[in-house]
Structures are given as structure tokens and as C-alpha cells.
Amino acid sequence: MSFYNHKEIEPKWQGYWAEHHTFKTGTDASKPKFYALDMFPYPSGAGLHVGHPEGYTATDILSRYKRAQGYNVLHPMGWDAFGLPAEQYAMDTGNDPAEFTSENIANFKRQINALGFSYDWDREVNTTDPNYYKWTQWIFTKLYEKGLAYEAEVPVNWVEELGTAIANEEVLPDGTSERGGYPVVRKPMRQWMLKITAYAERLLNDLDELDWSESIKDMQRNWIGKSTGANVTFKVKGTDKEFTVFTTRPDTLFGATFTVLAPEHELVDAITSSEQAEAVVDYKHQASLKSDLARTDLAKEKTGVWTGAYAINPVNGKEMPIWIADYVLASYGTGAVMAVPAHDQRDWEFAKQFDLPIVEVLEGGNVEEAAYTEDGLHVNSDFLDGLNKEDAIAKIVACLEEKGCGQEKVTYRLRDWLFSRQRYWGEPIPIIHWEDGTSTAVPETELPLVLPVTKDIRPSGTGESPLANLTDWLEVTREDGVKGRRETNTMPQWAGSSWYYLRYIDPHNTEKLADEDLLKQWLPVDIYVGGAEHAVLHLLYARFWHKFLYDLGVVPTKEPFQKLFNQGMILGTSYRDHRGALVATDKVEKRDGSFFHIETGEELEQAPAKMSKSLKNVVNPDDVVEQYGADTLRVYEMFMGPLDASIAWSEEGLEGSRKFLDRVYRLITSKEILAENNGALDKAYNETVKAVTEQIESLKFNTAIAQLMVFVNAANKEDKLYVDYAKGFIQLIAPFAPHLAEELWQTVAETDKSISYVAWPTWDESKLVEDEIEIVVQIKGKVRAKLMVAKDLSREELQEIALADEKVKAEIDGKEIVKVIAVPNKLVNIVVK
């Protein structure tokens, strides 16, 4: 057989690994550890797509490489299995979401195993397993005990027809719900919040210690959004009312000509004049129909209403009209802004729209034409005139503090984490509300608080989750006869994924989240690989929970993930017509190398695009494994380009990877393998070991595979192959194409044992040194010959070789040699006349 029969070989080795528990996590305390973590998937009904294996293959290569280097390797997999699609499916079909989830997990697991990943399945976790979410609930009770979990009235996106609140992302730009197209209103509701803001400074500062890309760190820094500025208090004219504004530029206070409150601000009703009351009520209603995203869109037309009231500018006593406008959010900052239209574009547009005064306080622009947003010396600012930004801020803050109407303030863009969902399919929040007005956490001895099985998971209609319908579960009575009601909100999907990497370390512990000694042994995670779409929320939430558990003494490290790597996206092929509209692949035919719309006959342009069901360009790994084999898929996805690049899927590229594996198979199975080394491949082999080792370490898998190809080409030029080089090469390719490597190892090593723990090959530095080098021979300063000579020859030897060369002889024939200058390892210069 001169080709690699994947249909026979791959299932054979997958069966072997499962039967022998080949990838069970090592526990030898004398060995170093390596914890390779994948972002665990949500097991959707669609199954794996070819984007999933890219990250999984990367961690698998590292895990196999580290095992061969003698490390204890922890390489686990699990399921982030709570989520809306399962609940939606259950509502549509009347089936239990747990059954749907279980079927999906079985399918995902089958697909993952077919790709030959070296997971330790004894450590599998599932966020919907009560034995798992017992500890998710336990963490919540600890947050509650420490005052970091609290209830608050929060405006939510309420959809009356759906009987539930929806996330900002589920609100369409026209203010209707994504599902059903129903009206969405902003309505205050009781919600659970987690006080992530208490950790803002630590979440910010500790980023410096992490081996993460600067772009991801910057995304987190921006999300946390630390600002140093001042709180300024404005009195409302003719009343005892006042309100506070946070500003990063208190030095521009002399240019503040009006103030804007969020329509929901608590002062609005109290300060609105009777003449403006109707307009204000109407505007507040309109604002409640919009999502936060729509309200803060910079491109939208500025709208607002004057309340009829005035604020007093604390530095110059001038009256400033108080407006309400939907671009100011009650949930952000203090819900009030001081407007400096000369130096802020949004304020400038608002001032122009409503004919409000614009006062320049920083020189350098023409504020009648546009806002000047650069820095400049202060003007029209009394005691700040002529000062730069830094000095002016210091002076104005001192003045405000002296007057008692302001002080320096550090704020964060980060908001507390809205932690409750009005859904059924999530972890029950372990809190009981008693009729005497108190609330208590469910005691640890009663955890897990198990999600009750029910067919009735329609929304309750009251804004509570479907759990409010389940009276038997809902109502409880204390020993003293006091009646209570369980919390009906469930946790968001983020909860289970905020700590799953800890449970992998000790997944079957019934007494605690995980054993302290095991946590000390394995933390932090050495490499975490996943998509950049989780750069902010998931990673921030996991870091927050980890720091909280560190404060409790549960975990020994301040940070969970030492190194983070985001793989790129695998794009599908798309087709566009002359208008730029996308055409589904099943409506396209290829003729003479061009692409045409089957129905219209129009020639189409081919371009990469994100894989999607609507474009029918999703590639299923099952089809690839069936046709080409898992090893081909693994090698192709690693060879496509740099791991962090987004690259289009290509059948031609897949075929190229398959041909390479067939060449490897033929090289090892058909070449004569000898016990003696003739030295012909010394340099090529040692270069390959060195390059592949270094490139795996630095996650440059595409260049590692390119080097393996270089060796195959070199080896194919020889008649025979030295057995140690054959073995070493098989070991080098094993992390990339493990099934093929196992099969070839059996033949060459004459063993029935797995290659997985065979010591990684080493290289001989002396074999990398060139024995010969090229020198140039110059005559009268012009290069006349290039010669391969032994390295480090003496001047005399070089001169002798150069003068004996036929080409040189012909050039100097009949001429007198004046002198010969020889520079070892470089050149020979012959001067003639």
C-alpha cells in the first residue's frame, strides 16, 4: 500500500488510545507540569465546524510535545452547556433541554474523538451537571456573604409579548426584539448584580504580569476604562436641589454652557417646570423605547428637551440650562454631563442643533466651525488663563475642593455585572426570600440546589423566570414556620465558564471545589487558546472570580491564565454579484475557472467571508475526516498560515496536505532503512529537529510543517534512510499527524507501544555547522570565480586552490601576478598586470 489509508488507521489508533487510557494526566510529582486549556464549546445542535479544531489542534500539538519532553500534561475538555438555544428548542418542541443538550454533547464528543485529540476524558466537566454547578452556586454564596452579590433595581429591555427581559444584543436598531419583532421598553426590574467594580484596580494592574497580546490587554484596559478627573457639584437655581457631574476635564469648566441629564435621572421630575412637563414626559417615553446602543450612537441625530430649569456654574456663577437627552445614560457615570460645546464634538452638535452658547476656553481652533478637541493654552478662563492642561486641572480641582463643590475622583467605565436571567435553563441562584423581608443563602449542606425538571418552561409573564410557575419547588417554610420563596432568576451562561479550568484539576471532589495541593500543583494555566471574541467579558469575569477565590484562600495564584493565545478565524468562500450582495454557494456554478449565478447567469466575484448557514459555506469536519482523514485536517489547519491569522478555507490546500502525508507514508514504508548512518542527512535531520522544536515552542506550526517537508524532500533524494533519523522524524510529525505517526512507529521501532511518551528527539549542534563554504575569487577587484572549499583553510591553502582553478588560470594566463590577498572563509583577490 503506497498511500496512507486513514479510514483503517485512524479508528484503529483512536480505539487503542481509549482502551489504554493513553492520555490520562500524569501525577508523578518529580516531573514538571504543563496545563494546556481550550475554551470549552457550547454544544450546539449544529455540531463542530472546522473553526473549532484550529485552536484544539494547537493545544493538542503542545500537549503531545510536552508529554514527549517528560512533562505531566493536563489537557482536558468539557461543555459550556447552559444556554438559550436549548431553552428555545425546549419551548418549541416541549422536550427537556437536558436531553437535547446530552445528545449534542454526544455528537460533539464523537466529532472531537474522530480528530485524534489527546484529551483526558476522565476529567470531562459539564456546567449543567448538578455535581458541577453545586460549586458554581457555592462561589455565589461566598460572593453573597462578602457583600459582592447584591440586588438592585436595574432598567432592562422588557418585551411584554415574550413575557421576559432580553439582552441589549437582542434589541434591533428599530427598537423591536430580534425574536418576533415585538416592541421593547425600558423597565426597572429587580436583578442580581456582582460587584466586579470592587476589583477594577487589581484587574487593571495585574494585566502587566500576563503573557497576553497587547491588543487583548488594551481591550480589557479600555473596558475597565479608568479615568482620573473630578466630581463637580452643580446647584439647581431657585431650589435646594443639586447634582454631580464627573468630568476628566474640570479645567474646561469656564466653557460649560449647559448641562444634560439622562431622561431617567432621579432629579428630572422634581426640577421640570410646568411649561416643559408635557415635552419632558413625552421625551422620556421615547427614550425608554431605545436600547443603550442606539441611544449612544455617535452618528444619530441629536435630540433633547429643556427641563425649564437652570444649574449654576460653580466657578463663574453663570446660569446654565438643564436639558435631558437620550445620549446620556443613567447607568453610566453619574447620569449627568456638563456640556463644553467648544471642545467636545457631541456637545458642539447639540449646541448647534438647539442654538446654545459656545464659549472657547482652549486656544487653537475655530469653534464656530467645529469643536476644537486638541490641547491648547487656556483662554476666557479667569485664573486659568495661559495655563496648560496639567497645571490648569490641578488648580481648578484645588479651587473646587476649597469651595466645597467638587473633588478629585477616579472612576471606571466598568459597570457591576448584571448576573440574573429570567430564564429556566441556567443554574438556580441559591437564595431564599422570606416573608419577614430578609433573604438568606441556601446552606452549603443543601447544595446543589437542583434545577427542577419541568415541561412548563414558558415565561411566567410577570418578568420572573419560568421557575416562578413551579409552586412546589418555589415555596419553602422555615423551621420556625416563616414562609419563603426561592429566587426565580437563574445565572447567566458566563457563570459556569468563569471557573471551569479549576474543576478540571480535581473534577470528582465531592467535599470542595478542588483540593488545595492539586491547585498549587497545576495553576496557573500555562496556555489558554481560544477565539478573540471572548477577549473581554469571559476573560474579565474569570479573572474576577479567580481573584475573589484567591482572597478566600481557595486558589494559590492571583491570575488564572499565564499565557493566552487567540487563534484566527477560518473563513469560508463567498460569492458576490455586481451590487456586492452575497450569493449562497448552492446557487453558484463554476465554468472555465470563473463563477456564475445559476439563476441569472451573472459572473460572480469570489471572496472570503465568515462561514454561515445562510451562505451555505460551512465546512463540516465529518466530511473532511471521511474524505481526507483527521491527520490531513490537522496538518492543513496548522499549515494554512500563522495561527493568529484569519485565512480562507481551500480544498486545494487540503489536497496538498493529504499528498504530503502520503509522501511521508511512502518515505518510511518503501525506503530501505539501515542501522548505519552514512552521514548524508546529518545536517538536514539536525536542522529539522532544531527548527521544529523551536517553532512548536513559539506556536509557529506552519513553519514547523514547512521544515518537515524540507526533510522529506532531502530524504527522498537518498536511496537509504538511517533508522534513528526515521524514528526521530516520525516523533517530530507525531504531534501534527498522530495516527500516521503511531502506525509508522510500529514498523520502524518494532514495538506495539504508543509513541506518545517516547522521549523527544534532540539535535547535535556540531552537525549544523557547514563543513564547506563558498569563497569568491577576484581578479583586479572583479569576481571571476566562486569556489566551494573546506572551512577554515589557511591563507596559503586558499591561494593554492584559487590559482589551480581552471577558470582563474584562463583569466590570468600570460599576465604577471603582482600579489595575492587571501582572506580565510571569504575571498582571494589576485592583483595582475
Curated annotation (Swiss-Prot):
Biological process per Gene Ontology, one example term: leucyl-tRNA aminoacylation
EC number(s) per entry: 6.1.1.4
GO cellular component: cytosol
Gene3D superfamilies with a match to the protein in the record: HUPs, Isoleucyl-tRNA Synthetase, Domain 1, Valyl/Leucyl/Isoleucyl-tRNA synthetase, editing domain
Any one Pfam family match given in the protein's UniProt record, by short name: Anticodon_1
Domain of life: Bacteria
Reaction(s) the record says it catalyses: tRNA(Leu) + L-leucine + ATP = L-leucyl-tRNA(Leu) + AMP + diphosphate
Localization: Cytoplasm
Keywords for the protein's UniProt record, in alphabetical order: Aminoacyl-tRNA synthetase, ATP-binding, Cytoplasm, Ligase, Nucleotide-binding, Protein biosynthesis
InterPro entries reported in the protein's UniProt record: aa-tRNA-synth_I_CS (IPR001412), aa-tRNA-synth_Ia (IPR002300), Leu-tRNA-ligase (IPR002302), Leu_tRNA-synth_edit (IPR025709), M/V/L/I-tRNA-synth_anticd-bd (IPR013155), Methionyl/Leucyl_tRNA_Synth (IPR015413), Rossmann-like_a/b/a_fold (IPR014729), tRNAsynth_Ia_anticodon-bd (IPR009080)
Positions with a binding annotation for ATP: K613
Broad class of where this protein is predominantly found: cytoplasm
Motif 'KMSKS' region location, chain numbering: 610-614
Sequence motif 'HIGH' region, residues: 41-52
GO molecular function: aminoacyl-tRNA deacylase activity; ATP binding; leucine-tRNA ligase activity
Database matches in NCBIfam families: leuS_bact
Sequence similarity: Belongs to the class-I aminoacyl-tRNA synthetase family.
Protein name: Leucine--tRNA ligase
